[in-house]
Amino acid sequence: MNLRLICAFWAATGFLCGQTSAKKLAESDCTAERLGASIPKEAIGEPVAAVTLSAPVWKPAAAPLPAYCSIDGSMAPVETSGKAKPILFRVLLPAEWSERAAQLGGGGMNGMIPNLTMAFGVTTGSGLIERGFATYGSDSGHGMAASDWALSDESIKNLGYMQLKKTHDAAMVLIQRAYGPKPRFNYFFGTSQGGREGLTVAQRYPADYDGIIANVPIVSFSSLMLAPELIRIQEKPLANWGTPAKVNAIRGEFMRQCDKLDGLTDGIINNYMACIALFDIKQGKKGRDPWAGKRCPGNRDPDPADTSAKACLTDGQISTLEMVYSPYLFATPLANGVKQFGMWVPGTDPSGSGLILPGRFSGQEGAAPDAQMHRHLGVIGVTGFLMQDPTANPLDYVEGGRWNQRRIELSEWLDSTNPDLSKFAARGGKMIVTIGTNDTLASPGAQLDYFQSVIDRMGREKVDQFARFFVIPQTNHGLSGMNDTTDGDGKTIEPAPIPNAYDRLPILMDWVEKKVTPPKQLTVTGGGRSLPLCNYPLYPKYVGGQASDAGLYICAR
């Protein structure tokens, strides 16, 4: 057999002729001859029609980034309808490789390859390329412009989970072609949609990853896309509309009842679980009324335009608040037996991300004849994925109605709610998850429900051996936040940032690579202050002294 035939045989299996095991990559290695023009579809663990590679591009060192080789690829869909789109992916191969790799998750509804030279919310120190990581990610199988992909089951499943495996497997082939061996340690880092993707790979592909950082994961993705419509459906009767004028009254009532629950009246609701229990009408004694002090006498609002914290709320407005701050029960259990969507946690941003809106929409009482249909970031998941008609009115959804079977199917594809992480734990995998309770873009209620489901399934002791479920109270989708400038006693106080900074990457790397188990309580800093970072369901309880010092708090239940 001549050399050309030998090289052709090895290329078909994913390896190129002449490659050697090495940690260094030179510009002369960043070529199609070395890295190839395609990858066999058999090397990809989920179905693809073909994998093609673009010509590699060498990026010279430019501070703070070292030199690296960038290669793009495209995975053709199996579906032939034309609605399914190719997955576009990219792999960055550093000149000095540390035998580590990291897959970076997306954001929003995806649609673009993430910036692989950065890792938001992962480290406060040197970046991944600077540390010698090979990094990789994809657009998940659709672009930002066209929407017909939302009518393709393959594209929806790509978004939900398949693109993660496909991109991983393609990246592993290219890393081996570049350096020889596979990575000693492979990680996944993501925030928001990327956080959900981090949970997804632990649940679906546990053998592929050693460590995961997942920030503010949109755990119950299918329900999160539907939830804004559920609120607008609740508000179909004009009497149920919670107007923007009532935001200060709602915020003030949350603060009045919950600020003091952590031992300190400071404009921060640290004891989030106790606050949830107060305003979740499905908990506690039947018929109790956490909003009694805000009800308009005789159910008549004397001044609907009153924007003060003293404004009253009508029975209809309170019924909507009860819906938003209590779990939403499904007509039929969804994937993994999930029976409810946790909705939102009482906080200082009751109108955030469209929880409260100023107008009326098509299908609601009092809407103008030419009123627009309600639209939001994830509405394509309702009209496209669920109703399979992008022109449909999302407010036509009925729980348990004609779309119920499709709802269950989408949940299987999109939701990252499997509580059984035993395979990930058994292979030595570690994860750090961080959420904020003032997050109106994701659902803190659903995140907390997921944490509890994992603990219920696996046991607290086992979970603590491989996972940390950290909660930073009163922080938003970016894990930042401020104290409210009116505390629970109604006093005006100075605004100050809530401490939120901690360096996740070295903690996770030490846990994975050196078996150094992190404590269950860390410290977050910011604005000249510090607070304990507590593992769910604990919270920072004030025990006395200078309130800006983490040492004067304990993590308590």
Model-derived segments and spans:
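N-terminal cap/lid subdomain of alpha/beta-hydrolase-fold enzymes
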Residues: 76-165, 192, 203, 231-237, ...
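Conserved alpha/beta-hydrolase "acid-adjacent" motif
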Residues: 441-445
